[in-house]
Amino acid sequence: TGAKSFDMAAFYHGLQMQLVVYMEEAVRLEERKHPGKKIVPAGIFYYRMKDPIVGKELDEEKLEEAILKELRLDGIIRQEDAVIQRLDADFSGNSLVIPAGKTKSGYSKASKMLLPEEFDAVLTYAQKRRTDLQGAMYRGKAEALPYEMGTQNGCTYCPYRDICGFDEQ
């Protein structure tokens, strides 16, 4: 992605479910490959597909660190030490790879982590939300009910905004 970040509020309202749905499918594929094994996702991430822009005056080590920071994954991590260690083997302080940091008392508040039961609740919610949305579509429900979050709404880039009849007032 460009600068896309995982937004839990947008996810909750069904506006940012694609990443979780893809992860669900990846879990299903792995379960088929490894019957009888429990597949536990480590996290849900966006990867920055861009050329990182960093200062050319940096030495090689600082340059690599700056590039890693620019390309750091964004999303949510299952908060389990073994999972975090596999995602970033050199994890200490602030990770250059995942959205996580450590303090003397544990993980930093800026870390984007969910306890295993919270992470599983996100997956369960996504399955229910997806099923509900599919059911509504199959029943023919197609109302003009665009979302509104902050300064954005569903009409902003909609190609049908001029003909749908929805009053944005």
PLM feature spans:
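RecB-family 4Fe-4S metal-dependent nuclease core
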Residues: T1-Q169
